[in-house]
Amino acid sequence: MEVRIDSSVKEKVESVRLGCLVYDVKVKEKNEELWGKLENEIFPQLVSVIEEKGINGVENISSSKKAYKSLGKDPNRYRVSSEALYRRIKQGKGLYQINTVVDTNNLISLETGFSAGSYDLKNVKGNIVLRKGAEGETYKGIGKDDINIENLPVLADSEGAFGSPTSDSTKAMVTLNSEKILTLIYCFSKDENLEKILNKSKEYLEKYAGAKNIETFTVE
């Protein structure tokens, strides 16, 4: 499996990079230790950060929103998922508990400010490309109606788009039956140490999701 970034994105967003982790896993419903960390450590820390600088003051959220503008998408109407998570924390709503992979994915996103997505590779066909959503392009979102992905940076395989930093499609969603996963960090900041983020993400996935045989790589 190859992952690459198409010129339709690179020409508009020079700083775009992808941090990738591919691994084997037995997905479970919940990890209590992870939720202890989220509720007792991460959520209170983020409330303080948001009070101090605001959500738009978080550098990696801001750079992601700038990337959307460069591609011709309104980031206030189509929010990057990391901003949506921060807004839930600000409003005291916490996070939805999904499963050990998705919950760890959300921890990574909260800690970095970047959107992250996790995808079941048995439902991904061929190579993966990050490209600009085509005119009129849509897909069925997880827990949502059809999402307009025109001008969004979208992940696509040989069959079409299946993911984005805003909301993923149902095609490759992670379930309790998933066994081979790609977790991908959408990085739109040239200053961020992506290798360091990948190492921390690997640690979290091993600890909280039971991930094994993790391969990490970056795409520019």
Please describe what each predicted stretch is.
Residues M1-E220:
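Charge-biased, low-complexity intrinsically disordered regions
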